[in-house]
Amino acid sequence: MAAGPISERNQDATVYVGGLDEKVSEPLLWELFLQAGPVVNTHMPKDRVTGQHQGYGFVEFLSEEDADYAIKIMNMIKLYGKPIRVNKASAHNKNLDVGANIFIGNLDPEIDEKLLYDTFSAFGVILQTPKIMRDPDTGNSKGYAFINFASFDASDAAIEAMNGQYLCNRPITVSYAFKKDSKGERHGSAAERLLAAQNPLSQADRPHQLFADAPPPPSAPNPVVSSLGSGLPPPGMPPPGSFPPPVPPPGALPPGIPPAMPPPPMPPGAAGHGPPSAGTPGAGHPGHGHSHPHPFPPGGMPHPGMSQMQLAHHGPHGLGHPHAGPPGSGGQPPPRPPPGMPHPGPPPMGMPPRGPPFGSPMGHPGPMPPHGMRGPPPLMPPHGYTGPPRPPPYGYQRGPLPPPRPTPRPPVPPRGPLRGPLPQ
């Protein structure tokens, strides 16, 4: 356990332990810091006259990461009722002091060094244990303390966040401490900040920087909608941040139909237009062999570019037109009825067209009436029909039932054997 020469030690993997009680020994110090990592050796300088240690020691670990971890978990724990101080024991530790020292006033007497360290270490690296000024006779706190940060960013954040906040039911005051041997000059001046920015040791070798000064995680890139490895949106989709294309008005060419094809015909009476004129191609009357250009290719399949609104104008099957002529007049012939069913012929002159056959599904449109004629009236109950009888109101008492009528008994057959007809 005895330490070798200082020149042979790994100063970066060695920690300083202060505030030790007189009962602490080197074996106890070894077992305590073994919880943080593999310990190479321990050393507690002793007085040559009394042979007692002087209240501090050194613990060398196998690696620098173990020393940083020991500083993180062992600093300010209580050993025999006294909080111990654990920090780096490197030879240039004093060069890390950039002057970011703050003063904390109006402290409650119950506040100790560990509470201050746990509270203010959230703002940055603390070089030394917080120093609470105490009465040398009684050991009671005088109500103020000092903390030395490793950077001005940490001290600025601590002053901004903690000044005026309540700690143990007392509002504390946090500000930069006065410099020693100076006339009212405080730390945190522009000259100190400039020297701290030019000091490479303050940025490269801070105590336990593995935990407090870890680099921030890289920000995730914004997701870009891509199609087949490019930054363009998929085909048919508008680019991000733009509005969808407007719906074309009735009669305009849809996007999927080439200009060479004739536009689909308009339904009768749509948009206030009347029937086509005599000079319009395909506007012949039924029975003259002229019909509208068929909007579907053979087989009843719609064109690939037609919209749902145009499909609805041509009927659910896409096999006819409202103005198509009767069978045999140039239009599409109707389907043959099943065997045993009458052939649905055209209605007589002046009669409304027939409705859908009985048993057809709801919503299935029947044949369109001729232009200018009204369809069949909606199904209404007969005049004077009031619906099914209503049940009697609650609490209604029925009258006495009439006595049952006596039913006549059947005649009793005669007793004895039946005789045949008497002889003449």
From Swiss-Prot:
Its main location: nucleus. The modification Phosphotyrosine is found at residue 56. The modification N-acetylalanine is found at residue 2. Residues 222-231, 269-280, 303-323 have a biased composition (Low complexity). Residues 232-268, 332-381, 388-424 have a biased composition (Pro residues). CDD domains: RRM1_SF3B4, RRM2_SF3B4. InterPro entries: Nucleotide-bd_a/b_plait_sf (IPR012677), RBD_domain_sf (IPR035979), RRM_dom (IPR000504), SF3B4_RRM1 (IPR034158), SF3B4_RRM2 (IPR034159), SF3B4_spliceosome_assoc (IPR052084). Pfam families: RRM_1 (PF00076). SMART domains: RRM (SM00360). GO terms for biological process: mRNA processing; mRNA splicing, via spliceosome; RNA splicing; RNA splicing, via transesterification reactions; U2-type prespliceosome assembly. GO terms for molecular function: RNA binding; splicing factor binding. It is found in: Nucleus. The keyword Repeat applies. Residues 207-424 are annotated as: Disordered. Keywords: Acetylation, mRNA processing, mRNA splicing, Nucleus, Phosphoprotein, Repeat, RNA-binding, Spliceosome. Residues 13-91, 100-179 form the RRM domain. One of its GO terms (cellular component) is nucleoplasm. The keyword Phosphoprotein applies. It is linked to Acrofacial dysostosis 1, Nager type: A form of acrofacial dysostosis, a group of disorders which are characterized by malformation of the craniofacial skeleton and the limbs. The major facial features of AFD1 include downslanted palpebral fissures, midface retrusion, and micrognathia, the latter of which often requires the placement of a tracheostomy in early childhood. Limb defects typically involve the anterior (radial) elements of the upper limbs and manifest as small or absent thumbs, triphalangeal thumbs, radial hyoplasia or aplasia, and radioulnar synostosis. Component of the 17S U2 SnRNP complex, a ribonucleoprotein complex that contains small nuclear RNA (snRNA) U2 and a number of specific proteins. Part of the SF3B subcomplex of the 17S U2 SnRNP complex. SF3B associates with the splicing subcomplex SF3A and a 12S RNA unit to form the U2 small nuclear ribonucleoproteins complex (U2 snRNP). SF3B4 has been found in complex spliceosome 'B' and 'C' as well. Component of the minor (U12-type spliceosome) spliceosome. Found in a complex with PRMT9, SF3B2 and SF3B4. Belongs to the SF3B4 family. Component of the 17S U2 SnRNP complex of the spliceosome, a large ribonucleoprotein complex that removes introns from transcribed pre-mRNAs. The 17S U2 SnRNP complex (1) directly participates in early spliceosome assembly and (2) mediates recognition of the intron branch site during pre-mRNA splicing by promoting the selection of the pre-mRNA branch-site adenosine, the nucleophile for the first step of splicing. This is Splicing factor 3B subunit 4.
